[in-house]
C-alpha cells in the first residue's frame, strides 16, 4: 500500500464513476428514444 501514490486513486475513481455515469445516461437515452419512436 505504501508504494501506491495516494493522489492517483481518487482521480481514477472519479474517472471511473464519471464513465459509468455517462454510460448510464447514454443507455437511458437509448431506451427513452426507443420508447418515444415506437
Curated annotation (Swiss-Prot):
Which positions, given as ranges, span the membrane?
Answer: 17-37
The protein's UniProt keywords, in alphabetical order, are: Chloroplast, Membrane, Photosynthesis, Photosystem II, Plastid, Reaction center, Thylakoid, Transmembrane, Transmembrane helix
As for membrane topology, the entry says: Single-pass membrane protein
Location in or out of the cell? Plastid, Chloroplast thylakoid membrane
A single Gene Ontology CC annotation of this entry is: chloroplast thylakoid membrane
Q: Which domain of life is it from?
A: Eukaryota
What InterPro entries is this protein classified in?
PSII_PsbL, PSII_PsbL_sf
Claim: Plastid is one of the keywords in the record? yes
Principal place of residence = plastid
Q: Could you tell me the Gene Ontology terms of the biological process aspect for this record?
A: photosynthesis
| Pfam family of the protein (one) | PsbL
Q: Which family does it belong to?
A: Belongs to the PsbL family.
Briefly, what is this protein's role?
One of the components of the core complex of photosystem II (PSII). PSII is a light-driven water:plastoquinone oxidoreductase that uses light energy to abstract electrons from H(2)O, generating O(2) and a proton gradient subsequently used for ATP formation. It consists of a core antenna complex that captures photons, and an electron transfer chain that converts photonic excitation into a charge separation. This subunit is found at the monomer-monomer interface and is required for correct PSII assembly and/or dimerization.
Subunit structure as annotated in this protein's UniProt entry? PSII is composed of 1 copy each of membrane proteins PsbA, PsbB, PsbC, PsbD, PsbE, PsbF, PsbH, PsbI, PsbJ, PsbK, PsbL, PsbM, PsbT, PsbY, PsbZ, Psb30/Ycf12, at least 3 peripheral proteins of the oxygen-evolving complex and a large number of cofactors. It forms dimeric complexes.
Q: What HAMAP family does the entry give?
A: PSII_PsbL
Provide the protein name: Photosystem II reaction center protein L
Q: What is the lineage of its organism?
A: Eukaryota, Rhodophyta, Bangiophyceae, Cyanidiales, Cyanidiaceae
> What gene name is given for the protein in this entry?
psbL
Amino acid at each position: 500500500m505504501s508504494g501506491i501514490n495516494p493522489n492517483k486513486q481518487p482521480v481514477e475513481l472519479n474517472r471511473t464513476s464519471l464513465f459509468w455515469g455517462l454510460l448510464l445516461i447514454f443507455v437511458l437515452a437509448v431506451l427513452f428514444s426507443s420508447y418515444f419512436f415506437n
